[in-house]
Amino acid sequence: MPILKHFQELRSRLLICLVFFIICFLISFYFSHLIWFLLSLPIKEISRLELINLAPAEALEVDFKMSSIAAFILAAPICFYQFYAFCAEALYPTEKRIIITLTLTSTLCFLIGVSFAFFTVLPLLFHFLAEYNAEAKALWSQNAYISFLIRLELAFGIIFQMPVIAAFLSYFKIIKSNFFIQHFRIAIFVLAFISALITPPDLLSMIFMMGPMLLLYLITIIVNRIFGKGA
């Protein structure tokens, strides 16, 4: 296929992705009240907490932020399909199977990480932070709450990719089967640094983030050993 045809096909597929994103954004914005109801579940049981808006347009900003994230999630399968369809002609059957397997596994791990954070970590963390000072009522900005929730959700989703990355690197012999064991001390330091970077500046938030990351690292070591020897 001539190079011009490739650019035309790429342009049309990017346009499809953009149109789907806009449609998903408009639908999400229309149902923003429902999205807010779902995202506020981790703090529903905290009686001492009250959310406030600190700026005239903060409520609108929150709706735009939630709708953008929801639109990205809803449009992601279509965008991935367009990307895959664009590259499929140049891929061998084995490469196609690897890409599909990695995508499905990575998506599953991401959803597990996000769900674990949403239903387990965040309710406990928000409850502790809201109840920490018993002498004062907790007043949080709605925008700050959503930003913090999204940041932590994304962090857990990305961290849960470690076993997938380990399997990929081990299978193709990019790293040795004992790589993650040899670099355990460095990994502890890196995980602690990441925990401190993406969580509020308090010890409990760091522990809530560090605990699952350590467990995932142990799972990553096992995956690394299995795929490293089996490849």
Question: What does each model-found stretch correspond to?
Answer:
Residues 1-231:
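Membrane topogenic/interface segments and analogous intrinsically disordered interaction regions
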